[in-house]
Regions:
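C-terminal catalytic histidine-bearing segment of alpha/beta-hydrolase fold enzymes
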Residues: 102, 113-171
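Acidic catalytic loop of the alpha/beta-hydrolase fold
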Residues: 42, 106-110
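Short beta-strand/loop motif that positions the catalytic acidic residue
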Residues: 95, 100-103, 107
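Mobile cap/lid helix-loop segments that gate and shape the active-site cleft of serine hydrolases
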Residues: 39, 43-91, 97
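Serine-hydrolase-like catalytic core of hydrolytic proteins
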Residues: 1-2, 110-111, 121
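Primarily recognizes the serine-hydrolase "nucleophile elbow" in alpha/beta-hydrolase
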Residues: 1-51
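Residues at alpha-helix caps and immediate loop-helix transition turns in enzyme cores, especially N-
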Residues: 47-48, 111-115
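Loop/turn elements at helix/coil->beta-strand transitions in domains of secreted/extracellular proteins
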Residues: 1-3, 29-32, 96-99, 125-130
């Protein structure tokens, strides 16, 4: 094996993007990443709430009325630090591996803004990046055997595979 990459869908896309941006050293950095309708940011107005709450918790879990002013401020700061760290568009740098993002413009679960932010950060840091936004398909399309061939992305499945194959051939 010459290269090892990561792939993730939805919250798994956040995990794959975390591996691509929060790695410890060059030996733990993937060589490329494939992100499919990924959760990227923890910003409340854009994130997927379930992923956010499972990863960093809710504000009410961090701060409440029973705290001293000092402890309230400390916890609120720690909460915001975690949100910043796990808003992966803020963690991209020139060493982030080449990335392809694939999603649908009508995703009603993970806002498209997640992928747009990550893609723009990749470009700003001169990281090789590709993004494919299909006009429909919603969220959660994929390759389950129960609806393969009749799911919401059927019309684009060939394009999806072509995009990934082209991306992989360039790595």
């Amino acid at each position: 094996v010459e290269k090892i990459g990561v792939i993730g869908f939805s919250a798994g896309g956040h995990l794959a993007a975390s591996a691509s941006t929060l790695y410890v050293d060059g030996t733990t950095r993937p060589d490329f990443s494939i992100l499919v309708y990924p959760v990227i940011t923890m910003e409340p107005s854009v994130t997927h709430t379930g992923t956010h709450d499972n990863l960093v918790g809710t504000v009410s879990e961090w701060v409440n009325d029973d705290l001293t002013v000092r402890e309230y401020a400390r916890r609120k700061s720690a909460y915001h630090d975690l949100m910043e760290k796990y808003s992966l568009e803020n963690q991209v740098n020139e060493n982030t591996p080449p990335t392809i993002l694939l999603l649908s413009s009508n995703d009603g679960v993970v806002p498209v803004e997640n992928s747009l932010r990550y893609y723009n950060s990749l470009l700003e840091n001169k990281v090789s990046a590709q993004m494919y936004i299909y006009p429909y398909g919603g969220h959660g399309w994929g390759f389950t055997t129960s609806n393969f061939g009749t799911d919401r992305i059927e019309a684009y499945r060939g394009l999806f595979f072509d995009a990934i194959n082209t991306f992989l051939s360039e790595q």
